[in-house]
């Protein structure tokens, strides 16, 4: 069955995006419309529209899978520090009890994964921790910008092992406690410091790999 126009667009977009995020389509890879159309089973028009949408999201540049640089990483962190520190402040005021419990659970799961030596799986819990806080800012435009920044950062993380930063889980716990105690300024300050440390740690990894 040939998908209709809207379904074909959605199928093409989700197919390409998923393969970018799972590392199948690596940074710098050229996306060829004709080949993708045959792979997905749609015409070239929805492929073209999917690529255009992914370009708008910053995931594709000049029909190549975006390959973030160290400078791009700094720009992304500047966005995250500004917006997520504000989101943490809002979370300290508005986060519901059930969400606070879920926030604590991400920390418990992260500690268990660390004990089990599954450091790469900690990324998912880290992402969930930040997503819970971001969603509490109650600002759809801010959420959209942060989701885009985090997606680009995820593309970057596929190239390096950035999961073993010292004290990352402890910092999450400090942020969680500030939010639980409704200390908005402390929550905001701790989030900013946490992301600065994240940025510096990641830049050190890039430098060690000779890609800075």
Give the predicted meaning of each segment.
Residues 2-5, 188-212:
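C-terminal effector-binding regulatory domain of bacterial HTH transcription factors
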Residues 1-93, 207-212:
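Short linear motifs at protein or domain termini
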Residues 42, 181-182:
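Residue-level signal for the nucleotide or nucleotide-sugar donor/cofactor binding architecture
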Residues 80, 97-158, 168-178, 186-196:
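Conserved amphipathic alpha-helical segments that form helical-bundle/coiled-coil interaction surfaces
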Residues 19, 23, 149, 153-156, ...:
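A short secondary-structure junction motif
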Residues 164-166:
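Active-site loop of classical SDR/Rossmann-like NAD(P)-dependent oxidoreductases
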């Amino acid at each position: 069955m040939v998908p209709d126009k809207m379904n074909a667009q959605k199928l093409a977009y989700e197919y390409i995006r998923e393969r970018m995020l799972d590392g199948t389509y690596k940074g710098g890879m050229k996306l060829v419309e004709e080949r993708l159309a045959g792979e997905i089973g749609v015409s070239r028009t929805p492929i073209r529209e999917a690529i255009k949408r992914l370009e708008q999201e910053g995931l594709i540049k000049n029909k190549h899978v975006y390959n973030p640089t160290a400078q791009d990483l700094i720009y992304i962190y500047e966005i995250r520090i500004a917006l997520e520190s504000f989101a943490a402040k809002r979370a300290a005021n508005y986060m519901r009890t059930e969400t606070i419990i879920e926030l604590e659970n991400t920390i418990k799961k992260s500690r268990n994964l660390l004990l089990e030596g599954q450091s790469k799986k900690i990324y998912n819990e880290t992402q969930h921790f930040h997503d819970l806080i971001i969603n509490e800012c109650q600002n759809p435009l801010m959420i959209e910008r942060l989701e885009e920044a985090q997606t680009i950062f995820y593309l970057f993380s596929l190239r390096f092992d950035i999961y073993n930063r010292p004290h990352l889980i402890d910092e999450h716990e400090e942020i969680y406690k500030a939010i639980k105690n409704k200390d908005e300024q402390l929550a905001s300050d701790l989030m900013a410091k946490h992301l600065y440390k994240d940025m510096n740690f990641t830049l050190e990894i890039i430098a060690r790999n000779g890609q800075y």
